[in-house]
Structures are given as C-alpha cells and as structure tokens.
C-alpha cells in the first residue's frame, strides 16, 4: 500500500489529496505521476525519520523523473538525509547536484555553508586554524549566495559574515 494511503498526519493527508487532484487535472505522463508518487512517499517517510525508506523512494523518483527542476528537489532531499545521518561529504555531493539543475535553491547553499562551518569548527578543535579558515571562507561564500537569492533570510549567517568581516 502506498505510504500516502497509510499516513495519519492531517497535513500529509491534505497534501496528498491536493496532489492527487492536481495530478488528475494537469496533463502529465504516467512516468511523471509515478515519480511524484515516489517523491511524495519519500517526503512522508523522511518527515517520520524513516530515512532508509525515504531514500528508496527518492532514488526511484530520480529514476523516473526527467524534469531537471523536479530532480533538483529530489536531490536536495537526499542531501538532507545524508546531512541528518552525519554523512557530510555525500550531502555536499547531493546539494551540488541539486544546484546544477536548479541554481536558485538558497536552502542548498545554506546547508552547504552549515556543513563547511561545522568542518571549520572541527578543525579548530583539532588545532588546525589554517584549515579552519579555509572551511569558514567556503561557508561564507555559500552563505553569500543563499543571502543573495533570498535577502532578509539567514539573519544569523548574515550576522556571522559581518562579525567575521567576510561580508562585502
């Protein structure tokens, strides 16, 4: 049974109903509909913390989805799961792949910056300030891109950029 039929969450049910109506009204191929079903089931599993199931659904959605914009969100969500699992190198790879298909994903730039900042903090703890600065500089570049796409968002990042004199 598809996950969308067993989820008891009101918001998920509402989303599923609206999505099903749109899939009937908007002209789409059966492959696109199936890809969206896997994507929707992946989001549902991810929201419940069932990352293995979410990844299976996302990979299947990637196999079926042909639209680069839609693929960018699938890749972004795969990156989120890898971030949650502490697999930062894999997460960065998926965020990069998402941005290749959709360069207007500020949340991907933000998440990449957070990972780089975290790695900078780790380098400081290991006593390597030179490596830390390189990671912080990379974080700054990603945050600048996120802020440029959505001015007024990422206030903490904006403040960090100012405090560390990395904001131009």
Swiss-Prot record:
Query: Could you tell me the keywords of this UniProt record?
Result: Chloroplast, Membrane, Photosynthesis, Plastid, Repeat, Thylakoid, TPR repeat
Task: Give the matching InterPro entries.
Answer: PSI_Ycf3_assembly, TPR-like_helical_dom_sf, TPR_rpt, Ycf3/AcsC/BcsC/TPR_MFPF
Task: Respond yes or no to whether keyword Membrane is given for this record.
Answer: yes
* Gene Ontology BP terms: photosystem I assembly
Q: Which PROSITE patterns match?
A: TPR (PS50005), TPR_REGION (PS50293)
GO cellular component assignments = chloroplast thylakoid membrane
**Gene null: resulting phenotype:** Non-photosynthetic phenotype due to the absence of photosystem I (PSI). Can grow only in vitro on sterile sucrose-containing medium. Under normal light conditions, mutant plants show severe pigment deficiency and leaf bleaching due to the accumulation of photooxidative damage. Under low light conditions, mutant plants show a light-green phenotype, very slow growth and delayed development.
Q: Where are the TPR repeats?
A: 35-68, 72-105, 120-153
Is Plastid tagged as a keyword?
yes
Q: List the disulfide bonds.
A: none
Origin: domain of life? Eukaryota
Gene3D superfamilies recorded for this chain? Answer: Tetratricopeptide repeat domain
The listed locations are:
Plastid, Chloroplast thylakoid membrane
| Pfam families xrefs | TPR_1
According to Swiss-Prot or TrEMBL, what is its membrane topology? Answer: Peripheral membrane protein
The record's function comment reads: Essential for the assembly of the photosystem I (PSI) complex. May act as a chaperone-like factor to guide the assembly of the PSI subunits.
- What do we know about how this protein assembles, alone or with others? Interacts with Y3IP1.
The family note in this entry says: Belongs to the Ycf3 family.
Q: What is this protein called?
A: Photosystem I assembly protein Ycf3
Name the species this protein comes from.
Answer: Nicotiana tabacum
Q: Which gene encodes it?
A: ycf3
């Amino acid at each position: 049974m598809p996950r969308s039929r067993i989820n008891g969450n009101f918001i998920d049910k509402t989303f599923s109903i609206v999505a099903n109506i749109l899939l009937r009204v908007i002209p789409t191929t059966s492959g696109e509909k199936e890809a969206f079903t896997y994507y929707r089931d992946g989001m549902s599993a991810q929201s419940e913390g069932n990352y293995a199931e979410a990844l299976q659904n996302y990979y299947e959605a990637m196999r079926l989805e042909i639209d680069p914009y839609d693929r960018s969100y699938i890749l972004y969500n795969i990156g989120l799961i890898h971030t949650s699992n502490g697999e930062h190198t894999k997460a960065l790879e998926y965020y990069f792949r998402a941005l290749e298909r959709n360069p207007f994903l500020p949340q991907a730039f933000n998440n990449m910056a957070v990972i780089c900042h975290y790695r900078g903090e780790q380098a400081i703890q290991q006593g390597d300030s030179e490596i830390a600065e390189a990671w912080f500089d990379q974080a700054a570049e990603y945050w600048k891109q996120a802020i440029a796409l959505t001015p007024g968002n990422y206030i903490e990042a904006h403040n960090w950029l100012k405090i560390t004199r990395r904001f131009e």
